[in-house]
């Protein structure tokens, strides 16, 4: 029986690429999403990957959503915590709501998804957790104090949880993408991309979602069983941590 992978924020962008790559690698894949129903259903039809809607900032919604996935596909062996939002503002203008929403999805959401799955992974003696953090969680970013704090928190969670899971056959790793050519990034004016963003990237281009996805496929595999508590920086040389 093939292993089951669950990807949060899996119906678009980097998450969609991760889902497609995991399916191509032979996994049974489920994609969580929270927003656009039409977009999610289109992804489901195009990819053949089932989609499930819930908000990862709610612990009970995660418990219920995971139960639906496991009833359909079987126990989840691989969890990719990819869901993330931004509520950018300079700190002196940031509201408690902007802070709380980003922390709730980008950091607490990782706990909410991982915690209900942890006991089952321990009992089965196998698990793969891959947390999609960000270059801005490594270096910080002006105007993104909330996002940078949440993504840095994901890295601390990764390192601590890796120590707890290692003896039970569970690995916990993180990937920190830089500028990736998602729909959101490519919507930035071409002048800004070419004059301000790409010159910061030593390889001279944006990354592709599929490049991040290939990192996930490796970390999910048996070949990566000796790698845990690690961070892969997929940023084209923009930042070395």
From Swiss-Prot:
Q: Give the reaction(s) catalysed.
A: a (3R)-3-hydroxyacyl-CoA + NADP(+) = a 3-oxoacyl-CoA + NADPH + H(+)
Q: Does the keyword NADP apply?
A: yes
An annotated Gene Ontology molecular function: acetoacetyl-CoA reductase activity
Q: One GO CC annotation, please? A: cytoplasm
* Keyword Thylakoid tagged: no
Q: Which residues bind substrate?
A: 88, 141-144, 178-179
Where found in the cell?
Cytoplasm
Q: In which pathway is this protein known to take part?
A: Biopolymer metabolism; poly-(R)-3-hydroxybutanoate biosynthesis
Q: Which UniProt keywords apply?
A: Cytoplasm, NADP, Oxidoreductase, PHB biosynthesis
The active-site annotation reads 147 (proton acceptor)
Tell me which InterPro entries the record gives.
Acetoacetyl-CoA_reductase, NAD(P)-bd_dom_sf, Sc_DH/Rdtase_CS, SDR, SDR_fam
Q: What class of enzyme is it?
A: oxidoreductase
Q: Name one GO biological process term.
A: poly-hydroxybutyrate biosynthetic process
PANTHER family tied to this protein: 3-OXOACYL-(ACYL-CARRIER-PROTEIN) REDUCTASE, 3-OXOACYL-[ACYL-CARRIER-PROTEIN] REDUCTASE FABG
Name of the featured protein: Acetoacetyl-CoA reductase
């Amino acid at each position: 029986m093939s292993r089951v992978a669950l990807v949060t924020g899996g119906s678009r962008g980097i998450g969609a690429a991760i889902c497609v790559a995991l399916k191509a690698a032979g996994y049974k894949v489920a994609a969580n999403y929270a927003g656009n129903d039409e977009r999610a259903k289109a992804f489901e039809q195009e990819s053949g990957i089932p989609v499930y809607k819930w908000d990862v900032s709610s612990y009970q919604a995660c418990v219920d959503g995971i139960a639906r996935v496991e009833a359909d596909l079987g126990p989840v062996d691989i969890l990719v915590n990819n869901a993330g939002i931004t509520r950018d503002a300079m700190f002196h203008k940031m509201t408690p709501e902007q802070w709380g929403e980003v922390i709730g999805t980008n950091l607490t959401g990782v706990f909410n998804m991982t915690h209900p799955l942890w006991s089952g992974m321990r009992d089965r003696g196998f698990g793969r957790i891959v947390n999609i953090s960000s270059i801005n969680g490594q270096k910080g970013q002006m105007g993104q104090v909330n996002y940078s704090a949440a993504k840095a928190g994901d890295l601390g969670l990764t390192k601590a949880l890796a120590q707890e899971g290692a003896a039970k056959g569970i690995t916990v790793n993180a990937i920190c993408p830089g500028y990736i050519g998602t729909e959101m990034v490519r919507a930035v004016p071409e002048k800004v991309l070419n004059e301000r963003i790409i010159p910061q990237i030593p390889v001279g281009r944006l990354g592709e979602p599929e490049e991040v996805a290939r990192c996930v496929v490796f970390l999910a595999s048996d070949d990566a069983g000796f790698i845990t508590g690690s961070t892969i920086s997929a940023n084209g040389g923009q930042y070395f941590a």
